[in-house]
Each structure stands twice: as structure tokens, then as C-alpha cells.
Amino acid sequence: AGRPHRIAVTDLIEQQRNLPRHITRVVVAVAHGPGVAELLEESGAVVVRTPPRGRPSTRDFVRAVTSCGAREALLLPSDADSTPVAKAAAEFLRDDDIRVAVVPSRSIVQTLAAVAVHDAASSFDDDVVTMARASSATRYGGVTVASKEAITTAGRCQVGDVLGLVDGDIVEIGADVTAVCQRVIERMSSSTSELVTLVTVLDCPPDLVPAVAAHLQSALVDLEVVAGGQPYWPVIIGVE
């Protein structure tokens, strides 16, 4: 019988990777939680940490690039609201003769996928294409809790309802985080899916990861769990 053949749990705070003062190419990524910020730093990225429901400034992106003396930069906004800011920063940096590309990423799971394939030894253009492909190949979803009554694409929700989203659209309404998470993964998965990534809060329901692992036992799909610590989202989901 099939079963998940790799379950990797990434701890929250372990160590911060120190980047050299001057590097040729830098990856700058936005992060909304301490866990994903640490993971990105350990992967070699310069992280722009943003407050809950906040977005970075143009200066944040520019400073992240110029502080390490890089002449090439890849910017990962990690959400739709930060994308225009990243594009504005890219224009500013180009005026300073820095080669810049904004790699499309609308969720932290797309950013993680892009960073995982970054290759500083490849050409700039090849690196951009590879990272963009990894990002676009990652469907993103999540589970959150309704803060007000509203009419959604999945029906009416009440305060406290658990909402499941896929690619930014509400597709599930329920009462239990784990159950809604499982249904969202079902919607996101296909016969070609290879990896499910869960980015969780610090107080993630203890049954969530075991339940998802059991849920995936019928297919040879990898499961990676990142203790992200992000606000407002009990779990963010990526499927590649």
C-alpha cells in the first residue's frame, strides 16, 4: 500500500545563517512569520520581515539588496499585496545599474518552492526561469477563521467558521481546522502531485499533521511540515 515516504518537520528557531557582506546575486523574500523567516535565512535568502496584515515598503526591498552589495537580485513578494511594492523597488534598483527580477509568488509556499531551486551558479536568466517555474507549479491554499459574517463563494459564513481557500478563493466552510485542511488538500491535489507542504502556526492542532499524513497514505506523496508561526492562518498549504 502506498504511504507518504518522506515526512520532514522543520523546527521553528534553530540558527540564523550569516550571509557574506558582498555577494553577486541575492534572493530577497518577504516573510510574515518567524519560522518561515528563519527557514528562508538558512536557505541563503535575505528576508524582509513584515508585521501581521502588513506589507513591506519599497525601502525595505532596496535596503535588503544594497546592504549586501549584490549586483543581481531576485525579489519574492510572497503575496499579492507586496507584488507592486517589489516591482517599484526593482525599478529603483535598475536605475542604480542592479539587475533585478521579481519572481511571481502569491504565497509563502510558492516562495519556498522558488528558493528551493535557486542556483547562484547558473546564469541570471536561467535562475529566474527555474524559480518562476517552481513557483507557478505550486498551487497554494490555506485555512483561516472567519472574523465576521459574510457571503462567500462557498456560501454564507459566520464568525468563528473555519474557511478553506484555494488560489485565493474560499472553497470550504466548516467547524474543524483539520477537517477543512484535508478537504482543501483534496481539492488541490491531482494524480501528478508529488509534494504537500504545510506551514503551520505555533499552536497547530495536534491531530492535524498525523491526519494529513494518513490522508495521503494512498499515494506516494511527500509531506513537508514547516512550523511557520504566521498570524491569522492556522495552516498554509502548498501542493507541487
Residue map of PLM features:
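N-terminal loops that bind phosphate or other acidic moieties
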Residues: 1-240
